[in-house]
């Protein structure tokens, strides 16, 4: 499972280094160094703006997710399903890190996520996300506002 946060940078060509522990998880837990980069679910900042980042899925996880979306396992109305396909499936790019662990983030995805020099890689269990550092600060603040207050639910999760 992907866990933890790593602050890193992206160069002018759009290359960034995937944290070593994330690369290790790709190979040891998912058995493949290939992965798919796509748009992450936007975070509503409650002020009319949204935080946009990227989600990175191991190839096998992506293939399962893609099948679920295509089969509409979430039973979404057609308009929402088509939006999901356009926002998640459409921009998805299969990638592999080079021998130094670097990956080229496709230009359209860099623009979408407003990636500047400093990035956060954030482990999310079976995937990891990539955020511009400024956006991630706002995402964290929103997460604190959204954090569950139900102590029984948190206890059931072991938190």
From Swiss-Prot:
InterPro entries, alphabetized = MraZ, MraZ_C, MraZ_dom, MraZ_N, MraZ_sf, SpoVT-AbrB_dom, SpoVT-AbrB_sf
* GO biological process annotation, one example: negative regulation of DNA-templated transcription initiation
The cross-references to PROSITE patterns, in alphabetical order and at most eight, read: SPOVT_ABRB
Query: Cystine bridges: which residues?
Result: none
Q: Which SUPFAM superfamilies match?
A: AbrB/MazE/MraZ-like (SSF89447)
* Source taxon at top rank: Bacteria
A GO molecular-function annotation: DNA-binding transcription factor activity
Q: Which Pfam families match?
A: MraZ
Instruction: Give the record's GO CC terms.
Output: cytoplasm; nucleoid
Q: Which UniProt keywords apply?
A: Cytoplasm, DNA-binding, Repeat, Transcription, Transcription regulation
Looking at the record, the residues that make up the SpoVT-AbrB domain are 5-61, 92-135
Q: Subcellular localization, per the record? A: Cytoplasm, Nucleoid
The primary location reported for this protein is: cytoplasm
The family assignment reads: Belongs to the MraZ family.
Q: How does it assemble?
A: Forms oligomers.
Protein name in the entry: Transcriptional regulator MraZ
Species in which this protein is naturally found: Trichlorobacter lovleyi (strain ATCC BAA-1151 / DSM 17278 / SZ) (Geobacter lovleyi)
């Amino acid at each position: 499972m992907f866990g933890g946060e790593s602050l890193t940078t992206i160069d002018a060509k759009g290359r960034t280094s995937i944290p070593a522990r994330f690369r290790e998880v790709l190979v040891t837990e998912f058995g493949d160094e290939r992965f798919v980069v796509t748009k992450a679910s936007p975070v509503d900042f409650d002020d009319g703006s949204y935080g946009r980042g990227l989600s990175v899925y191991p190839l096998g996880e992506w293939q399962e997710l893609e099948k679920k979306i295509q089969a509409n396992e979430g039973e979404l109305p057609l308009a929402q399903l088509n939006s999901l396909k356009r926002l998640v499936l459409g921009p998805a790019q299969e990638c592999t890190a080079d021998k130094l662990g670097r990956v080229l983030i496709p230009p359209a995805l860099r623009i979408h996520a407003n990636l500047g020099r400093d990035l956060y890689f954030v482990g999310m269990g079976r995937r990891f996300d990539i955020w511009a550092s400024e956006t991630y600060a706002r995402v964290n603040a929103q997460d604190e506002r959204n954090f569950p207050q139900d102590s029984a639910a948190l206890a059931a999760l072991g938190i």
